[in-house]
Design a protein with these regions (language model features):
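RNA-interacting cores
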Residues: 1-213
């Protein structure tokens, strides 16, 4: 049985596979999903009797090579799970048309703001009007960090027509945060959409949040 708050175990496993390198100190140009394919057991956790799938994507291929080499020599994960097979997913072919994305993990948006002379963290969700601009701003910042050209047509927005959108409580490293489980629509150049699909959206993609399917 894998506990409900296993997400921090995935983070620890991926960092173990990556080893000691500068990726931990840089802005996260990678994203990864939670475990897919399990059955929930009430009050206990998840059962992966038929195995689980985990998606990991990096903008910089050198880290992918490090990850795969390490997995092959050390496939053990946690709670009795270990990697049995590594496969490569073909990159989607995007066009200039708006692209719709489902989420592999919820999108987490936060900013440090000053109110009444005091700085504090503010969190944003799919029903906050600022959220679309903040997701777009973060993605553009990551594109600049990656050395990609600016995309003035880039716009990220929550698909508010989705009926089952919700706010989800996520616990990582003992800290509880709420994030948005709601699909997104991305406008912009095909390269920008591919970049978003690779690195994820919002804050915390390096700790398993904001991964796209």
């Amino acid at each position: 049985i894998v506990p409900f708050d296993y997400q921090q175990k995935i983070v620890g496993t991926i960092h173990k596979w990556l080893g000691n390198n500068e990726i931990h100190d840089k802005i996260s140009l990678y994203s990864f999903s939670w475990l897919l394919g399990g059955n929930m057991i009430v009050d206990k956790g998840y059962n992966f009797s038929k195995g689980a799938t985990l998606f990991i994507s990096f903008y910089e291929n050198k880290y992918l090579k490090v990850l795969i080499d390490t997995i092959l020599s050390d496939p053990k994960m946690f709670c009795g799970l270990s990697v049995k097979e590594v496969t490569f997913e073909r990159e989607p072919a995007f066009t200039e048309e708006p692209a719709f994305f489902r989420l592999a993990t919820p999108i987490f948006i936060k900013r440090l703001i000053e109110e009444n002379g005091k700085k504090e963290q503010k969190f944003y969700f799919y029903d906050d009007r600022e959220s679309n601009d903040l997701m777009t701003e973060t993605l553009k910042h990551k594109m600049r960090e990656a050395g990609l050209p600016d995309d003035d047509t880039l716009k990220v927005e929550f698909d508010l027509s989705y009926m089952n959108k919700k706010k989800k409580l996520v616990t990582i490293h003992g800290i509880k945060n709420k994030a948005s489980m709601c699909p997104v629509i991305i406008h912009g150049r095909p390269e920008s959409k591919l970049f978003a699909w690779t690195v994820g959206l919002g804050n915390g993609t390096g700790i398993s949040l904001g991964a796209l399917l």
